[in-house]
From Swiss-Prot:
This is tRNA N(3)-cytidine methyltransferase METTL2. Disulfide bonds: none annotated. Its EC number is 2.1.1.-. InterPro entries: Methyltransf_12, METTL2/6/8-like, SAM-dependent_MTases_sf.
Length: 389
């Protein structure tokens, strides 16, 4: 029986659900006929209004003492988030397999995943902000490529352990995936459900010990196929439980935006060293002028395009150029760097919501070359909408 696709979503020759970007709003009168529309173009007036809104909510900045608190106690804010929401806040990301087929390397097509779950209706926003939670006591204004494993054992230190290329969790696997910022498993468990290849192994880590505890107590967690651990992406002294040049895929889904911009480059460069030559790094995150950015109020801005939510967690809004700089400075090559401009619709309340996400795929060269370190543009760079909107 042929697959049934929603109106406006064309079926491809092989019957697969197409990637995002195939449902266009040609008639504004039909805006409430679907829940989402792809590649929605902004008018010059709308882009200018978004830029004005960001300029307005970018000052005053959160005072220095509160900024230090949000950085030093970042893990506590995420622990609190997961204690409150447990595993009920984010939906399982079944749409990832359509956008990133590297996560299901043995599948030429998806089976058993309903179309509505494959559809990338992404919503990853934290709770809203309240000015009261940010008051300061100070006076300051506030392609799927796989390379055979290396034959020579690689020895590294992992915290207090010494591991070799032949003795680490999942060392016998031939295809290894690491998700950074895994939360309670909304990406990991769909990957494990979709892949029944015994030679595939998944690693997953999160800043929050509470999130990892919840993930490990989930009935779907299988230590023979998955290794979950607590890890601070920004801590240069912490090691990963795998040697360099050992991973096929690294996944970053709405996680890089949660760390201080000045620490992003070192984090990506460190992750890059874990990839095999030919391995890929996959990212989906917030784009500049996303609805979530425009909704922030005065007093919640930490620095240019970097904000704190009401629960103390933080979020940065990227441009394509910033992400390209991060990845290429880490020695990776661009495969994909796309803006997903989505118009989401609440048909019940007759509301329209303009979303901006960026989706990237960068690969590690097969022929390794020495690369110079290029610093990330400072977070206070101009919030020009050129190249994004």
């Amino acid at each position: 029986m042929a697959a049934s696709f929603p109106e406006g979503v064309p079926e491809t020759e092989d019957g697969k659900r197409p990637q995002f970007g195939h449902r266009f709003l040609s008639d504004p009168a039909r805006v409430f006929h679907h829940n989402a529309w792809d590649n929605v173009k902004w008018s010059e007036e709308q882009a200018a209004a978004a830029e004005r809104k960001v300029q307005e909510n970018s000052s005053p900045l959160v005072c220095p003492e509160k900024q230090v608190d949000y950085e030093v106690n970042a893990h506590k804010y995420w622990d609190d988030f997961y204690r409150i929401h447990e595993n009920g806040f984010f939906k399982d990301r079944h749409w990832l397999f359509t956008e990133f087929p590297e996560l299901a390397p043995s599948h030429s097509h998806l089976t058993g995943v309903p179309l509505e779950k494959q559809r990338s209706d992404v919503c990853e926003d934290g709770p809203g902000l309240t000015a009261e939670q940010h008051k300061c006591s100070c006076a300051s204004p506030g392609c799927e490529t796989q390379v055979p494993p290396l034959e020579e054992p690689v020895t590294q230190k992992l915290g207090h352990l010494e591991i070799s290329g032949e003795e680490f969790p999942g060392s016998s696997a031939t295809y290894r995936i690491l998700e950074v910022g895994c939360g309670v498993g909304n990406t990991v468990f769909p990957i494990l459900q979709t892949n029944n290849n015994p030679n595939l192994f998944v690693y997953c880590c999160d800043f929050s010990a509470t999130a990892i505890e919840l993930l490990k107590t989930n009935s779907q967690y299988d230590p023979s196929r998955c290794y979950a651990f607590v890890h601070d992406l920004c801590d240069e002294d912490q090691s990963y439980p795998v040697p360099e040049d050992s991973l096929d895929v690294i996944v970053l889904i709405f996680v890089l935006s949660a760390i201080v911009p000045d620490k992003m480059q070192k984090a990506i460069s460190k992750l890059s060293r874990l990839l095999k030559p030919g391995g890929v790094m996959l990212l989906r995150d917030y784009g500049r002028y996303d609805m979530a950015q425009l909704r922030f109020k005065k007093g919640q801005c930490l620095s240019g395009n970097f904000y704190v939510r009401g629960d103390g967690t933080r979020v940065y809004f990227f441009t394509q150029g910033e992400l390209d700089t991060l990845f290429t400075a880490a020695g990776l090559e661009k495969v994909q760097n796309l803006v997903d401009r989505r118009l989401q619709v609440n048909r019940g309340k007759q509301l329209t919501m303009y979303r901006v996400w960026i989706q990237c795929k960068y690969s590690k060269p097969l022929a390794l070359r020495s690369s110079q370190h290029v610093p990330i543009p400072h977070a206070t760079e101009s919030s020009s909408h050129s190249g994004l909107l």
